[in-house]
Amino acid sequence: MEAEVINQLNNTLNDLEKRSEDIRVYMDYQGKKDRLEEVIGLSEDPELWNDPKRAQEIGKERKILEGIVLTLDNIASGIEDNRMLIEMTVEENDEEGFAAVQEDVAGLEKQMADLEFKRMFNQPADPNNCFIDITAGAGGTEAEDWAGMLFRMYSRYAERKGFRIEILEEDDGEIAGINRATIRVEGEYAYGLLRTETGVHRLVRYSPFDSNNKRHTSFASVFVYPEIDDSIEIEINPADLRIDTYRASGAGGQHINKTDSAVRITHEPTGIVVQCQNDRSQHANKAAAMEMLKSKLYELEMRKRNEEKQALEEGKSDVGWGSQIRSYVLDSSRIKDLRTGYEVGNTKAVLDGDLDGFIEASLKQGV
């Protein structure tokens, strides 16, 4: 074993120790550890299960806290253990044992990188599940097909992350793709990961629907908003709501239900409209639509609160509903984020859900 390799491994452990100390302060390790002990006590109370929703919230909080506290504990013990193992393997000239130490340290580095990534989740709703609205722009079949491609891209991204997805509302295009859709994404930090995807996505390609094989430009809008749990209070006056029911429809506008089970809710003071046709039960669709409305009202309030702050921050773009954020030029094999400058050439991988590079770049730059 070369001295340079041994020194490099020891330096890596020293660096990990320093980063661990920094992140303990930033993430309030002691505060989270104390809260975890409280949450564990609450979760072990048999009375908790009399309130399933509260039990679910406690379970979710416990999982998030354990993800931080136990990871930092594991990194700390791993640093000390591997320092001793380095000494032992060097003394015994145990190359196989030293290789195992190198592998374990690489694992510690990965855990630390994951924690440092979570530092970028600085909004209260970042750990929450989220909803994604996808709407085709003007342009008929071209735009509807593009909206369908985005629908698949986000579905595949969610699958890659181990998230659960639920289609709440889907209006198929006349020939291909979708006119609009709403999906619910369930998973740890789903909103934090996907929130910077809000905006207009532009596609440039040679159209498969054009017999002359001309180049076409299409647009679709994406809007991501968090699912709000009972820890965040959103007051809704029933008098402000207009509730309409209609028959759920499938491809080409054909009715797939004989009863008016689909629900559309309009919040008249803001003009926000939500709709759900996922369930055959009108009651279930209304409950789901109300959750979506609460989430959209929360997102609207957060945007209002941040408006003045964002206006003062130089270099930060307004990622509003009408802002073009990303360009997908398929014939040139180029996808570029217009806010961060991040660009890739593997268009197939991105459209198959490989969005990590774009999301990491946008979070790092505070988009």
UniProtKB/Swiss-Prot annotation:
Top-rank lineage group of the source organism: Bacteria
Entry protein name: Peptide chain release factor 2
Predominant location: cytoplasm
Record PTM: Methylated by PrmC. Methylation increases the termination efficiency of RF2.
PANTHER family noted in UniProt: CLASS I PEPTIDE CHAIN RELEASE FACTOR (PTHR43116:SF3), PEPTIDE CHAIN RELEASE FACTOR 2 (PTHR43116)
Keywords: Cytoplasm, Methylation, Protein biosynthesis
Localization annotation: Cytoplasm
GO CC, any one term: cytoplasm
NCBIfam families reported in the protein's UniProt record: prfB (TIGR00020)
UniProt entry tagged with the keyword Cell membrane: no
Family to which the UniProt record says this protein belongs: Belongs to the prokaryotic/mitochondrial release factor family.
